[in-house]
């Protein structure tokens, strides 16, 4: 009787460990993963056509992507994710012609303008 009871309890305990529902009840720590270049709103707002690559490099830092086939295009990307789910994503693409900045694209431009406007409103007495 004792051996049968111990064997049955061991089997139930082993099978209980296989339950996915029970495991999900216990929270686990998930790292917040930050990848890419987090660009300062003032630095993005300071970009002007006619700037050299060196000036842009000093202002924004090294780009995440420098395409070997499109050397006149730099991509700055920023992602924040937790548990494999992206919480925040922003992109900025900078285009050059003959080593001079000609245009920029990306959602960072609008976010930078809004952030600067908010800062100016909060700085006023």
From Swiss-Prot:
Q: Which PROSITE patterns match?
A: PROKAR_LIPOPROTEIN
Annotated GO MF terms? protein-macromolecule adaptor activity
Please report a single Pfam family linked to this protein: BamE
Q: Which residues form the signal peptide?
A: 1-17
Keywords for this protein: Cell outer membrane, Lipoprotein, Membrane, Palmitate, Signal
* Main localization, broad class: membrane
Q: Where does lipidation (N-palmitoyl cysteine) occur on this chain?
A: 18
Gene Ontology terms: cellular component: Bam protein complex
The answer on whether this UniProt entry bears the keyword GTP-binding reads no
Per the record, lipidation of type S-diacylglycerol cysteine is found at 18
How this chain sits in the membrane, per its record, is:
Lipid-anchor
Q: Which family does it belong to?
A: Belongs to the BamE family.
Quaternary state and interactors: Part of the Bam complex.
Q: What does this protein do?
A: Part of the outer membrane protein assembly complex, which is involved in assembly and insertion of beta-barrel proteins into the outer membrane.
What is the recorded name of this protein? Outer membrane protein assembly factor BamE
Which organism encodes this protein? Neisseria meningitidis serogroup B (strain ATCC BAA-335 / MC58)
Q: What is the lineage of its organism?
A: Bacteria, Pseudomonadati, Pseudomonadota, Betaproteobacteria, Neisseriales
